[in-house]
UniProtKB/Swiss-Prot annotation:
InterPro entries named in the record: Hem25/SLC25A38, Mitochondrial_sb/sol_carrier, Mt_carrier_dom_sf
Organism: Aspergillus niger (strain ATCC MYA-4892 / CBS 513.88 / FGSC A1513)
Protein name: Mitochondrial glycine transporter
Domain of life the protein comes from: Eukaryota
Cytoplasm listed as a keyword: no
Family: Belongs to the mitochondrial carrier (TC 2.A.29) family. SLC25A38 subfamily.
Lineage of the organism: Eukaryota, Fungi, Dikarya, Ascomycota, Pezizomycotina
Amino acid sequence: MSNNAVYAVPQVKTTKTSSKTTFHFTAGLFSGLTSSILLQPADLLKTRVQQSQNASLLPTVKAILSSPNPIRNLWRGTLPSALRTGFGSALYFTSLNALRTGLVQTNGIAPVTNSSSALPKLSNTANLATGAAARVAAGFVMMPVTVIKVRYESDYYAYRSLFGAGRDIVRTEGFRGLFSGFGATAARDAPYAGLYVLFYEQLKRRLAGLSSSSSDQQPLKSSSINFVSGGLAAGLATTITNPFDAVKTRLQLMPGRYGNMMRAVRLMVQEDGVRSLFGGLGLRITRKALSSALAWTVYEELILRAEVQWGSKGE
């Protein structure tokens, strides 16, 4: 039995509407909004833990839970986070599909229409490159929202509103302040996204093979394979790239002190040790694994269903 046969996915008739940008943008937006809203507390705790080596998870959680409005405080920064992740995911998935489709057409590869994936199948190198390029492009566009989100979530600042945070950043640092930490963000996101897509596609093939080799069991559904593959891929890619995330957080919180990536790394290691580069790793793995698994599963399922629906209309 082939790997594709284990996926419980209907045959899709390829039509012009199958590759519509609107499908990928809408599916990416919905998947990003869903994961960001559900997992905002983990993102907020990660920011608080990473802002200083002296901050640890349990005291941070206790402090928030003992505050007058613990639920509200756990979801503090949800709006900028939802905007950043929602529209960032929409831009990312749209760009990723465009890049991968372009490579398929350029190389004359026949598109795969009977698998669990909404994306064309490419080589490992192409998976790495397209994932990295799409993520950096989306990250640059959404960078101002990211900076405002990090400042608003942190307890270093006493911003009462998102507008106030943005206005203060522009007033004290200029528009350049809205792009603080972009170098570290790109250095984190490019390898993370590239590795993620690479691991994700490889894991899906492996899980499909394991499922097909067990003839006495019911084949795994595409959504199950996508979810497990997404979580495992995120865990691996997150561990490898966490130092860049820790540096990025410091640069966005205190750009005047840390200045640039190299200076930030040097100061962090001198003052807090190498361990500071892996601050918030547990929280980041938890959030990334869940958010990536959820976002990619929702995205792929929405695209596959959209293609089935529009493909049948085109008959």
